[in-house]
């Protein structure tokens, strides 16, 4: 081992000149520098920043006296002079000073005590980091040795492997004999240790995580991103990729054989016939061979025909289906993609938003029976041929509403594009099927081709209205030969398994003669038409149809009243039994929800007469007056054919229901406004499909009356008390007059014209006529009538919102409560609200008067605004005290004083006053004053007030339609409307921003019962049906208190409106609703 010669001089010449930079002086006392033997500068420059080559730490011997080690810019650690001397550093170098044997005292107290230089943690860190690196050790005699640094001892003895003496001039590599395996240099001999090309940061400068590697642009040594080449797949078939034909990856067998034979003399024994593996059959023409062949074929047939073989093969092949088809493939059976018909979607879940979007396109949805949840029955497509079954021709355009002949006047036929019929099966007796009303909603077009008059499929599909709620079958009574809307439209909602009927051509059905019952053959044919129905369903439907045909009878009512009460809405599944019944077959729809005739068509329609005359204006005697939403005049006796009404439930309902003393006799020639009294509230909150609840959407220009149809089927809204009506479906409503509308499809925003099935003079709004004819409704008419708030088309995008006013905390209004006809005010471009404040006809005091007022909110349409407040206040309107007002003969539509929101002026206290201004309740007894306050406050219970903000409403219709008529007050949704005396919370009010009153009030309501909406003024209004069952003097409110009301409300499927606190005068309360 080479020993460096002892030092002759106190300091080495190689040491740099002294510098002030880093002095690591060991205090005389023998203690180490405060930082552990390292001068201050080192702390900040532990590793030189320069390139790795520049950082080459060197170690020098540490004098026993305590010299330090310095690390220079070149990484040199030089031995330091004895203690008296300062240890200098070359310029720019950091010094690492450490005294041998010193304890730094740096470590935590509990750490073990190391000997010697091991206590200098920083120096030890650097030295261990360079283990394995090449180092040059310079000893005191000036010789330099090169080797690989291996380790060091606590006394700073350096062990170096593969050491050889480094020549002054590089003369190639060292010779083998000059290399010493290991040398230990004592600290006393070492002057300088130099490590070259050391990178202290190599372990920390890069990240080795997957993400760091993936982010590194240098992937697999490539610095640029790989350019993707387009894959040219060639033919989709895989013939080109057969392994046998692809020789690109190897030798052709023949080439190999040839190569081996030529180069190695090896001849292949390969035989393509593989004779060594198989026994070739030698075919010959001998008789014996042929007999063997025949015998083999016979055996094969026997084997293949044996049950065991077949069973085994069937198990393997499973009817020709592969494993993938059996276990993983998505099977889509049914009609083609083009048809959204129910049938094609049998069994498939369709998300609600999609159902809503597609409903108008004609996708038929069965109403689902689950939970009474309204199913959307698909509306007939807007286009003539959207229904799968509907005939594509123009002829198909004529659709009878509710299967009624489509001949009705355009007015009656006002298409309701947006309306969706929902049927909630839950209410139906299990036997019943509910069919969403035919696209009453869908536009009705006069039948262009006779063929479109296919008889409407029968009631089988026709859903019966839930008990107690009359389904406004067709808003207008339409002679419906088959009471059923297209079966396709309706689905059978009865408890019986829901069967969606495929929509049959609605038009076809409707065009058939209204009164005539479908013959069984026809029924079968229709059923057969429905695509995608399973046989089971078809059988079920046929059964239902036959049963219906056999059992369907018009039930004459001794008086219109009787007819109304006796028939639960359900009853109306009329399928006119025979042509003789055609007349009867026309059902009057009691849109108001007179439960009895819910499906009945207007009596007038019932006659075999052609359905409504095409002209909106003409009112054929045959045609019933356009049914006002409330109109369902009591159906003429016999009008209502309870189709297979469940006798039990019907009887029950009949017992429960009371006749409407105010009902007028039905005169087919007169337009008739039937009073719909919801005999019972529909049991299920779910929207009904029966009525064709169509909401006409009027185009902006048109002023629409509410169409007779209500949007009764709107999916119910499930509301928690806090919930706002979430589900309003926005339907565009147009204001066009019914007569006007029938002719064209509604403009984009408008719904197909609603039909006023009853023929009423074109001029009179159907509601008015109906109201006049029917007299005040006893009970809220169709439970469905729900308000449909729509916004003028202007704000199509906005959801209509109804917000409850805070003022009426106690009573949320429930859509269900509003049973009165929903008045749809459509707003055209101008939202003029025509509110007929006039109370909807109020029957005598004994009858509850419907209270709902509709205030339009017209904002921004100053000119129209006036209507809201007709200047003429009608005293009658003022709800004074509890005196019920009998219907006013023709209260002006706006009865309120200009300043005030119109209140229904029934004598009864109604909570639903709506003041355009702030809703401050004033006792109903107070006449509405210009003051902002509404009389509502006087009600014993606060009624929830809802304001609809016009702008907010995007033609939305709340689902109130579903709301059963059940008066909320009744604890049970199903409960029949309370009889007079029962308190109902009347409630709906719409607030609209106060409008300037300057405008003339728009059209007075000819009949008090129905608010007249001037056809001309289009305005969007949310209408809220009035609960008609209310009795004057009744305290609004549910028997059970607010919670019960809410619960009831939910049961009723109504929309619960919370209260809006602190509305300022002029503020709109918005009705909130969602799909």
Curated annotation (Swiss-Prot):
Of the GO CC terms on this record, one is: cytoplasmic stress granule
Query: According to its UniProt record, where is this protein located?
Result: Membrane; Cytoplasm; Nucleus speckle; Cytoplasmic granule
Please give the chief subcellular localization of this protein.
membrane
Keyword entries, A-Z: Acetylation, Cytoplasm, Isopeptide bond, Membrane, Methylation, Nucleus, Phosphoprotein, Ubl conjugation
Q: Where is the composition biased (Basic and acidic residues)?
A: 316-328, 505-516, 571-584
Where are the Phosphotyrosine modifications? Answer: 118, 264, 309, 349
According to its UniProt entry, the protein's GO biological process terms are: mRNA metabolic process; stress granule assembly
Q: Which residues carry this modification: Phosphothreonine?
A: 632
Topology term for the membrane? Peripheral membrane protein
Q: What does this protein do?
A: Involved in the regulation of stress granule and P-body formation.
- Tell me which family the UniProt entry assigns to this protein: Belongs to the ataxin-2 family.
Assembly with partners or alone:
Interacts with MPL/TPOR and EPOR and dissociates after ligand stimulation. Interacts with DDX6, G3BP1, and ATXN2. Interacts with PRMT1. Interacts with CIC and ATXN1.
Specify the protein name.
Ataxin-2-like protein
Q: Which organism is it from?
A: Homo sapiens
Q: Which gene encodes it?
A: ATXN2L
């Amino acid at each position: 081992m080479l020993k460096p010669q002892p030092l002759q001089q106190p300091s080495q010449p190689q040491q740099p000149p002294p510098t002030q930079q880093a002095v690591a002086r060991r205090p005389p006392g023998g203690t180490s520098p405060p930082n552990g033997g390292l001068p201050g500068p080192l702390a900040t420059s532990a590793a030189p920043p320069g390139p790795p080559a520049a950082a080459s730490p060197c170690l020098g011997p540490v004098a026993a006296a305590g010299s330090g080690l310095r690390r220079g810019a070149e990484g040199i650690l030089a031995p330091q002079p004895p203690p008296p001397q300062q240890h200098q550093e070359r310029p720019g170098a950091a010094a690492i000073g450490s005294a041998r044997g010193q304890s730094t005292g740096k470590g935590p107290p509990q750490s073990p005590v190391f000997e010697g230089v091991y206590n200098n943690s920083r120096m030890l860190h650097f030295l261990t980091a360079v283990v394995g690196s090449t180092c040059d050790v310079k000893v005191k005699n000036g010789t330099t040795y090169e080797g690989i640094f291996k380790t060091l001892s606590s006394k700073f003895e350096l062990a170096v492997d593969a050491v050889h003496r480094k020549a002054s001039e590089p003369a190639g590599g060292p010779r083998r004999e000059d290399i010493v395996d290991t040398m230990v240099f004592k600290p006393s001999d070492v002057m300088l240790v130099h490590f070259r090309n050391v990178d202290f940061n190599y372990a920390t400068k890069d990240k080795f995580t997957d993400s760091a590697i993936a982010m590194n642009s240098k992937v697999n040594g490539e610095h640029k991103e790989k350019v993707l080449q387009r894959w040219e797949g060639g033919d989709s078939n895989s013939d080109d990729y057969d392994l046998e034909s692809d020789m690109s990856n190897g030798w052709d067998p023949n080439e190999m054989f040839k190569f081996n034979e030529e180069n190695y003399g090896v001849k292949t024994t390969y035989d393509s016939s593989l004779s060594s593996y198989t026994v070739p059959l030698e075919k010959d023409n001998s008789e014996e061979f042929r007999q063997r062949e025949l015998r083999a074929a016979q055996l094969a047939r026997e084997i293949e025909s044996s049950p065991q073989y077949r069973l085994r093969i069937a198990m393997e092949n499973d009817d020709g289906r592969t494993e993938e088809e059996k276990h993983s493939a998505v099977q889509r059976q049914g009609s083609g993609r083009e048809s959204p018909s129910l049938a094609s979607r049998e069994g498939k879940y369709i998300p609600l938003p999609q159902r809503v979007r597609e409903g108008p396109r004609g996708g038929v949805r069965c109403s689902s029976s689950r939970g009474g949840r309204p199913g959307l029955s698909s509306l007939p497509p807007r286009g003539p041929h959207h229904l799968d079954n509907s005939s594509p021709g123009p002829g198909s355009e004529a659709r009878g509403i509710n299967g009624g002949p489509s001949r009705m006047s355009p007015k009656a036929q006002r298409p309701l594009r947006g309306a969706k019929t929902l049927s909630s099966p839950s209410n139906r007796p299990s036997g019943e099927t509910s069919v969403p009303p035919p696209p009453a909603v869908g536009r009705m077009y006069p039948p262009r081709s006779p063929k479109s008059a296919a008889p409407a499929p029968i009631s089988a599909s026709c859903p019966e209205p839930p008990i107690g709620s009359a389904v406004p079958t067709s808003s207008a009574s339409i002679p419906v030969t088959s009471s059923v809307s297209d079966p396709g439209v309706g689905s059978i909602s009865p408890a019986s398994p829901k069967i969606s009927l495929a929509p049959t051509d609605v038009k076809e059905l409707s065009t058939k003669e209204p009164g005539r019952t479908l013959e069984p053959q026809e029924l079968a044919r229709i059923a057969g038409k429905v695509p995608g129905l399973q046989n089971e369903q078809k059988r079920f439907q046929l059964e239902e149809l036959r049963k219906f045909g056999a059992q369907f009878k018009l039930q004459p009512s001794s008086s219109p009243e009787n007819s109304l009460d006796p028939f639960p809405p359900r009853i109306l599944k009329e399928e006119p039994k025979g042509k003789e019944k055609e007349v009867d077959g026309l059902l009057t729809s009691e849109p108001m929800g007179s439960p009895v005739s819910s499906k009945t068509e207007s009596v007038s329609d019932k006659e075999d007469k052609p359905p409504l005359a095409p002209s909106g204006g003409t009112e054929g005697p045959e045609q019933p007056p356009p049914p006002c939403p409330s109109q369902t005049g009591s159906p003429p006796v016999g009008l209502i054919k309870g189709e297979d009404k469940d006798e039990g439930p019907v009887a029950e309902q009949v017992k429960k229901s009371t006749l409407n003393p105010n009902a007028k006799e039905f005169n087919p020639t007169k337009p008739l406004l039937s009073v719909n009294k919801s005999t019972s509230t529909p049991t299920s909150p779910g929207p009904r499909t029966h009525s064709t609840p169509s909401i006409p959407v009027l185009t902006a220009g048109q002023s629409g009356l509410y169409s007779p149809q209500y949007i009764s089927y709107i999916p119910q809204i499930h509301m928690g008390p806090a919930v706002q009506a979430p589900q309003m479906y926005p339907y565009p409503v147009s204001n066009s007059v019914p007569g006007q509308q029938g002719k064209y499809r509604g403009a984009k925003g408008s719904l197909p014209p609603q039909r006023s099935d009853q023929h009423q003079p074109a001029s009179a709004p159907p509601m008015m006529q109906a109201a006049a004819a029917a007299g005040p409704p006893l009970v809220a008419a169709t439970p469905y009538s729900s308000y449909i708030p729509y916004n003028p088309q202007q704000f199509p995008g906005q959801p209509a919102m109804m917000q409850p006013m805070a003022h009426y905390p106690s009573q949320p209004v429930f859509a269900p409560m509003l049973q009165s006809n929903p008045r749809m005010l459509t707003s055209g471009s101008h939202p003029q609200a025509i509110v007929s404040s006039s109370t909807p006809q109020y029957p005598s005091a004994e009858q509850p008067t419907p209270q709902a007022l509709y205030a339009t909110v017209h904002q921004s349409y100053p000119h129209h605004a006036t209507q809201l407040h007709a200047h003429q206040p009608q005293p009658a309107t003022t709800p004074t005290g509890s005196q019920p007002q009998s219907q006013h003969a023709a209260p002006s539509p706006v009865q309120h004083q200009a300043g005030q929101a119109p209140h229904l002026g029934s004598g009864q206290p109604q909570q639903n006053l709506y003041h355009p201004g702030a809703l401050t309740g004033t006792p109903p007894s107070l006449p509405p004053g210009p003051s902002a306050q509404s009389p509502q406050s006087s009600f014993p219970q606060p009624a929830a007030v809802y304001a609809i903000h016009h702008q907010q409403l995007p033609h939305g219709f709340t689902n109130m339609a579903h709301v059963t008529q059940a008066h909320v007050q009744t604890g049970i949704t199903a409960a029949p409307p309370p009889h007079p005396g029962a308190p109902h919370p009347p409630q709906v009010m719409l607030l609209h921003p106060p409008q300037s009153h300057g405008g003339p009030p728009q059209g007075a309501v000819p009949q008090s019962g129905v608010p007249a909406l001037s056809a001309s003024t289009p305005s969007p209004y949310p209408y809220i049906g009035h609960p008609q069952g209310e009795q004057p003097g009744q305290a609004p409110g549910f028997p059970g208190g607010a919670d019960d009301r809410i619960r009831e409300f939910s049961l009723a499927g109504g929309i619960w409106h919370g209260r809006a606190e602190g509305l300022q005068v002029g503020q709109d309360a918005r009705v909130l609703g969602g799909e």
